[in-house]
Design a protein with these regions (language model features):
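Class I SAM-dependent transferase core
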Residues: 16-68, 76
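A short SAM/SAH-binding and catalytic strip from SAM-dependent methyltransferases
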Residues: 134-148
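Class I SAM-dependent methyltransferase SAM/SAH-binding core
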Residues: 68, 72-126
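A short acidic, Gly/Pro-enriched loop at the edge of an enzyme's catalytic core
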Residues: 126-136
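Core SAM-dependent methyltransferase catalytic element
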Residues: 201-233
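A short glycine-rich, Lys/Arg-flanked "PGG" loop and its adjoining helix->strand segment in the class I
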Residues: 82-83, 149-164
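Conserved class I S-adenosyl-L-methionine
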Residues: 164-187
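C-terminal motif of bacterial Sec signal peptides marking the signal peptidase cleavage site
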Residues: 12-14
Length: 233
């Protein structure tokens, strides 16, 4: 019954998002990395350094939580999130590529992960139901979001009270498949998020930044785009 209710909420979220006229958002004022693979690194290598457990610990992901795995790819985190939140928790695994979504759905069914749902999102809208998630996890994919302000704006209402967006990325230029922390903070704050925690995570290839929805979400036409400028000489 709980799974059916969750799936119904996802369906309603998709219908609501499609029915409304799309507002105008500013484009990203920096390069956007292309999607080159559904996997960031080999799962066995990641498990050798206990990556997923360490990230979930830092993110405060506990049994019974509802978590969205955005840009889930082949499901490295999806599988481990399912184990962490347990039968009383829920995991939504989302990707924007239909073929990746389909392969992940096959894996979820094969491994009988009854607390996991798999959903197709849009580049500028994760299509998540409002006030539904304790954590939203994005690992090594933020730099691939083609419309970050639109995406983050639509994501904002999906957090529950006390919910957090957890971003893991490399501290390098976006065109090199990373996001400089100051640029990330600027883009997040521009859409109404607030930085609540920052940790270096060399074992996961970069850093972890946690944001809540404590700021006010502006109207789309009031969002001021960010860019890292080279200092004047």
């Amino acid at each position: 019954m709980r799974r059916a209710f969750f799936l119904a909420a996802l369906a309603l979220a998709g219908c609501d998002g499609a029915a409304k006229e799309a507002p105008a958002f500013p484009p990203a004022d920096r390069p956007v990395a292309s999607i080159i693979s559904a996997r960031w690194s080999n799962e066995e290598a990641r498990d050798r350094v206990n990556e997923a457990d360490k990230i979930m610990d830092l993110a405060g992901i506990d049994p019974g939580m509802t978590v969205a795995d955005i840009g889930a790819g082949e499901g490295y985190y999806t599988i481990r999130l399912s184990q962490r939140v347990g039968e009383k928790g829920r995991v939504l695994a989302q990707d924007i590529l239909p073929e990746v979504r389909d392969k992940l759905a096959e894996r979820v069914n094969r491994e009988r992960l009854d607390n996991v749902s798999v959903k197709l999102g849009l580049p500028g809208n994760p299509m998540l139901p409002a006030k539904s998630f304790d954590r939203v996890l994005m690992v090594h994919m933020y730099h691939e979001i083609t419309a970050p302000y639109e995406f983050l704006w639509h994501l904002h209402p999906a957090l529950r009270t006390g919910g957090r967006v957890i971003i893991v990325d490399a501290d390098q230029p976006t065109q090199d498949h990373g996001t400089p922390p100051l640029l990330l903070q600027c883009e997040m704050e521009a859409v109404g998020y607030r930085l609540v925690e920052f940790q270096q995570t060399a074992f996961a290839g970069g850093y972890l930044a946690a944001y809540d929805a404590g700021g006010k979400r502006p109207e789309p036409n009031a969002i001021k785009p960010c860019a890292l400028r080279k200092p004047a000489r």
